[in-house]
Amino acid sequence: MSKKILVVDDEDDILHFLELVLREKGYDVATASGGHEALTKAQLEQPNLILLDIMMPQMDGWEVLKLLRVDEETADIPVAMLSARTEAKDRVQGLQEGAIDYICKPFSLQDLLVKIETIFEQVGKR
């Protein structure tokens, strides 16, 4: 059974690019273009990993992460923040609030794929 990744980003080009690449690598991919949709899909689809953008309208990634962590149905889903915010304080905040990784945009595809595999290895050892 392939692992399911939920990609959350309000930029359609990034969403579609990641969906295409991750499917080519054998992952089952779901997408959401906003925070409310992400929360619904996380509960319904129970992905193995969520790649979550921070800067989104209406509900940003920080709020989504907080709500994922307090819901017992989604609290244990690994979340990797995926953001153009590159300051150390943002990376620290993401990790302190429960993200398993913080990936800065722009990212290299190879780096992203290695990080995803590393996350699945870490989660598998728990």
What are the roles of these predicted feature ranges?
Residues 16-24:
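Charged docking surfaces used in two-component/phosphorelay signaling
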Residues 31-40, 61:
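Helix N-cap/capping motif at the beta->alpha junctions
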Residues 40, 62-75:
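Short amphipathic alpha-helix used as the core "switch/output" element in two-component signaling
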Residues 45-51:
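Active-site beta3 strand of CheY-like receiver
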Residues 56:
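Receiver (REC) domain active-site loop signature in two-component systems and cognate sites
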Residues 63, 86-103, 114, 118:
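Alpha4 helix (beta4-alpha4-beta5 surface) of REC/receiver domains from two-component response regulators
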Residues 117-126:
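The C-terminal output helix
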